[in-house]
Each structure stands twice: as C-alpha cells, then as structure tokens.
Curated annotation (Swiss-Prot):
This protein's name: Hydroperoxy fatty acid reductase Gpx2
Species per Swiss-Prot/TrEMBL record: Synechocystis sp. (strain ATCC 27184 / PCC 6803 / Kazusa)
Subunit structure: Monomer.
Gene Ontology biological-process annotations: cellular response to oxidative stress
Thermal dependence summary for this entry: Optimum temperature is 37 degrees Celsius.
Family in the record: Belongs to the glutathione peroxidase family.
Class of this enzyme: oxidoreductase
One MF annotation (Gene Ontology) recorded for this entry: peroxidase activity
Length: 154
C-alpha cells in the first residue's frame, strides 16, 4: 500500500502532492490538551533545523486519546500558532486507530501495533515508505530520532 497522496489540510484544502513527494516526512498525531503537547516546541525546532534539507513535518490532530483534541480546525490552528508558533502543515482531524482509522494511518501502522497515545511519530523516506516509528514519549530532540532523520535525508 503506497503513502496516500490525497490528504486534506486543517483548513479543508487538499495537500499538494509535491509538498511530500521525494521528501522525508515526519507524521505526528497531535493534540492540544495533552501532557505531551509541549512536544510542539521540539517539532518546530526540528522543522527549523531540517526543513531546508528536505524534512517535512506534518501534524495530524486526533481526538481518540482522552478527548484531548476537541477543538475546531480554527481553534487548533489558533492554539498551535499562538502558543507554539507552529508553521508546519496540520492535516484535518483523523482517527489513528479502530474501525475508522484513516487511510493515512492504515498505511503508517500497516500490520504494526495500534498507536498508544498522542505524539506517536512515523518517519517516511524519500521513497514514500515508513523507515522508522517512534513512540509518543520519544521527544523531538531525541538523538535516535534525529539520527534517523539525518540518515533518511542522506
């Protein structure tokens, strides 16, 4: 199963395929009212450090874990911009587990275990395949995560 190319941003517009084509992409299921929400700061730092080298960070709001992302698209966008200065792409809210798991997360999880909580991370190589998965407790400044990003970037 290939990486889905028909993705919709938080503001309801289609994500242009060239945004992720031939790029290294870090998908992260995010939430605004979680103990791990401060990871947004680290994701912004990763975006600044590796964005020009070909890393694309994409946040995927999800309300499946403790209803910690209840906001509307506008509320999510305002919160992330105001509190964390998020400039990377946020997709529309999605289910990452269960019978309504989005096609994106069907691809990312594959035959693996369900996502355990907010801020699970999937690193996609330039070939569009999953090269690494990191649990929610792995912070964006983790040396193993950075090493995987650098390796994928070449």
């Amino acid at each position: 199963m290939p990486l889905p190319t028909s993705l919709t941003t938080l503001d309801g517009t289609p994500l242009a395929p060239e945004v992720i084509a031939d790029k290294v992409v870090l998908f992260v299921n995010v939430a605004s009212k979680c103990g791990l929400t401060p990871q947004y700061s680290g994701l912004v730092a990763l975006d600044k450090a590796y964005g020009e080298k070909g890393l694309v960070i994409i946040g995927v709001p999800c309300n499946q874990f403790g209803a910690q992302e209840p906001g509307s698209p506008e509320e999510i966008k305002d919160f992330t911009k105001t509190k964390y200065d998020v400039d990377f792409t946020l997709l529309e809210k999605q289910d990452v587990n269960g019978p309504n798991r989005s096609p994106l997360y069907q691809f990312l999880v594959g035959d693996g275990e369900d996502i355990s909580w907010n801020f699970g991370k999937f690193l996609i190589g330039r070939d569009g395949q999953v090269v690494a998965r990191f649990d929610p407790q792995t912070k964006p400044d983790d040396t193993n995560l950075k090493a995987a990003i650098e390796k994928a970037l070449g």
